[in-house]
Amino acid sequence: MPREIITIQAGQCGNSIGSQFWQQLCLEHGISQDGTIEDFATEGGDRKDVFFYQSDDTRYIPRSILIDLEPRVINTIQTGPYRNIYNPENFYVGKSGLGAGNNWGDGYQTGEQVHEEIMEMIEREADGSDSLEGFMMLHSIAGGTGSGLGSFLLERLNDRFPKKIIQTYSVFPDTTSAGDVVVHPYNSLLAMRRLTQNADSVVVLDNGALSHIAADRLHVQEPSFQQTNQLVSTVMSASTTTLRYPGYMHNDLVSILASLIPTPRCHFLMTSYTPFTGDQVEQAKTVRKTTVLDVMRRLLQPKNRMVSTVPGKKSCYISILNVIQGDVDPTDVHKSLLRIRERRLATFIPWGPASIQVALTKRSPYVTMAHRVSGLMLANHTSIATLFKRIVRQYDGMRKRNAFMEAYKKTAPFSENLNEFDEAREVVMDLIADYEAAEDANYLNPELGENASADTDKRMA
């Protein structure tokens, strides 16, 4: 029984990433630009219906809702090479076409005005599923639409579908440089509250780390958004391969998330992918040889993480799931795990199992890969809190001066007071405290904290 997933793309960033993601999925499943199956795509074994449904004329249509408050990116999709695969009823473009002006409040209040139309699209897609497992939202949290309207939709989805999983792929701003959006600390903090309270799992991608990886792997000084979006769509397609080419384990979202998220609040995941090759990304550096050990070792290198964090002395992994694609012998996997353990390449929480979980998955027979093995790591790591701390620090600096506050006060959520900001800050501070507490051996029984012994560092020993 397929467990369907509906994708919701909100804002410029969400739609740009989404459009690349659907192109990648079409290539991997042998679906042509108009949704028909290519003549060569005769091998079975894949589950197309998790992400696509078949129309009356047997074309494959993405289970996707595309939402933006300004028309530019959606116009590009509607005139691009893959324009015919989407359901034309599933586009929502803001009536004024002005966007949300990089203002969370603007995006959120627009959500209140237009939610009936958008929820109707979502409910129509949900009704068309046999056994809906959940939603995947793609957005960025720095601007107005992805963060504000995205926040509103997360709340609504949670109310309307309380039993369904909500996973987001959230692009965080580059907190190490000024960036294009001056008010990103405000927007990010407000969106973070909803990601903490209304999503089951958040895959964090940050523009800073994506640019570093793109610059390093692709030899370009200033990577374009298209290149960084390509990295994101590669990660998204890899993280969904176990759903689309199912094996015995990790073949639905619930089982993937259950293995990664032991406590409900700490559900922010980081990713690494290797090797990025010319198949997914133009002019990528070549990696001469890929063995399972080599791929697994590279996945653990901090420079391959798609999040800029500053690990402290006590930072550690809460959980790791490696999705290994390609021609792999399970005994190689076992040997590689032993080697990683012997060399203590990964430090784990002191209160849980110190194990890297591995999902071996087929790769698409229709896409030629330059490498024998490629891998994606989905990890829950306590150092992600350092990214949240940077956002709070930047928010505090701006809030102290009341910088740019007038624009927010003009919107409905802030018309009477600024409590929304204070509540969001409190939620994010609690989240940071939760991740820091997870580094402690007595996380599960805090009352023992006073008598903790010093030797709780748990590397894979």
UniProtKB/Swiss-Prot annotation:
Keywords: Cytoplasm, Cytoskeleton, GTP-binding, Microtubule, Nucleotide-binding. Disulfide bonds: none annotated. One of its GO terms (cellular component) is equatorial microtubule organizing center. Gene3D superfamilies: Helix hairpin bin (1.10.287.600), Tubulin/FtsZ, C-terminal domain (3.30.1330.20), Tubulin/FtsZ, GTPase domain (3.40.50.1440). One of its GO terms (biological process) is meiotic spindle organization. It is found in: Cytoplasm, Cytoskeleton, Microtubule organizing center, Spindle pole body. GTP binds at A142, G143, G144, T145, G146, S147, G148. One of its GO terms (molecular function) is microtubule nucleator activity. InterPro entries: Gamma_tubulin, Tub_FtsZ_C, Tubulin, Tubulin/FtsZ-like_C, Tubulin/FtsZ_2-layer-sand-dom, Tubulin/FtsZ_GTPase_sf, Tubulin_C, Tubulin_CS. Tubulin is the major constituent of microtubules. The gamma chain is found at microtubule organizing centers (MTOC) such as the spindle poles or the centrosome, suggesting that it is involved in the minus-end nucleation of microtubule assembly. Belongs to the tubulin family. This is Tubulin gamma chain.
